[in-house]
Amino acid sequence: MTFGLVLLTFNEIEGIKELWDQIPFDEFDECFAVDGGSVDGTLEFFQQMNFSVNGQSKKGRGEAFRIAFNKSKSDFLIFYSPDGNEDPKDIKLIKNHFSNDDSLDIVICSRMMKSAHNEEDEQIFKFRKWANNIFNLFANLFFNKNFYKGYITDSINGFRGFKRSSFNILKLDAEGFTIEYQSTIRAFKNNMKIKEIPTIEGQRIGGESYAKSIPTGLRFINCLFKEILF
């Protein structure tokens, strides 16, 4: 049983510098980054740290996932974005769940379950969280065969790990931020075993999110209808 850690980056120099020493690289058989074309010093930082980087000729988070599995030889891959939203302490927890139960197909860090925290929780109007919960409800209603006993609370969050053999079965073709939503839906369709763990979502370190609310929401709607129809 081998494990790989993948850092997904696109202009994350502030985040990667602040979080680097908290990432448990020593826990993994291989570690590398997939970078979407950073121009802010992220690539130079990786070079300074002698850290392997795979570039993308085709942009998109979905493409980054596929590149990672093509480049990796590990049985399990964990994806981490060093932007401040994702808690590096949870990386080892994801790995431990796979180590303790190799029947798991996907492990997801949930921002919505009990003991978890979403970055909008202190706000009065939680538009992003509410939208996520709606998309999540639809995914469970339409596709989750174990809806009542195995309701998945955060089908969208990108902080997750996959078993290689399971990822290959999913045959994911989403290009951008819908890759995780599509992977959860297709895992439901294939009756895969998904484990969620509560996570504390932090505030972004530097810059702005590349997942703009309205365009991203429209892509999620498109993804949902495609999975319903096909």
Please name every model-derived segment.
Residues D29-F32, L43-K71:
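Conserved donor nucleotide-binding strand/loop of the catalytic core
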Residues W20, F28-G37:
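Short beta-strand/loop segment that forms part of the nucleotide-sugar
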Residues D35-L43, G84:
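A conserved acidic beta->alpha catalytic loop
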Residues N11-F25:
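Short, well-formed alpha-helical segments that are part of the catalytic scaffolds
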Residues Q56-K59, E63-K71, F76, K89-F177, ...:
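Acceptor/aglycone-binding surface of glycosyltransferases and processive sugar-polymer synthases
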Residues L172-E175, T184-G202:
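Catalytic donor-sugar/metal-binding loop of nucleotide-sugar-dependent glycosyltransferases
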